[in-house]
């Protein structure tokens, strides 16, 4: 089974979707997704004490411009093991503007089963300390792979949904041979 392709399509909708987790909250190991194998692989280990402030994961049946599933920051009160399936809904998006002119986007997702975070409806409701920790972690992570970040931007639910829709259409075109309808 390849989790990227074999998850039922109705479990991946823009308003609620299943995330498969990668990096556990607090971990200094950075796991990345191997699309061919459908598994996680160790990308690098952080030699500092900057661990993931939140769980991270990937959205099946989506495809970014890099040819990989959407990465997500998963707002959840507890660390979750890698490859756990979690029902989530989008809260917003964080865009990392890279010094080389590129952009790296992450959808910010709230775990539906988490009483605290499921009440968070917008990025504005994420506590400032949590937002700062996310930015610090993502900047450090990009620095480790030699992609320095020049600016970060928190965007609302509408931007997250547009990004999700574009990546889902890209997936359908690339892997299912479906041409998206013109709007």
Language-model-derived ranges and their functions:
Residues 1-183:
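Hydrophobic N-terminal alpha-helices or hydrophobic patches in metabolic proteins across all domains
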């Amino acid at each position: 089974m390849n989790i990227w392709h074999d998850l039922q399509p109705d479990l991946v909708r823009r308003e609620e979707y299943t995330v498969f987790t990668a990096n556990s909250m607090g971990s200094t190991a950075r796991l990345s997704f191997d699309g061919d194998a459908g598994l996680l692989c160790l990308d690098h280990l952080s030699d500092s004490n900057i661990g993931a402030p939140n769980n991270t994961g990937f959205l099946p049946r989506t495809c970014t411009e890099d040819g990989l599933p959407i990465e997500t920051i998963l707002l959840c009160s507890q660390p979750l093991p890698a490859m756990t399936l979690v029902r989530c809904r989008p809260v917003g998006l964080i865009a990392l503007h890279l010094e080389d002119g590129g952009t790296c986007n992450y959808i910010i997702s709230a775990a539906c089963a988490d009483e605290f975070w499921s009440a968070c409806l917008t990025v504005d409701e994420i506590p400032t300390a949590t937002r700062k920790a996310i930015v610090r972690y993502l900047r450090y992570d990009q620095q480790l792979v030699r992609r320095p970040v020049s600016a970060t931007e928190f965007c609302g639910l509408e931007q997250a949904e547009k990004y999700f829709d574009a990546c889902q259409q890209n997936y359908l075109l690339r892997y299912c041979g479906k041409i998206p309808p013109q709007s």
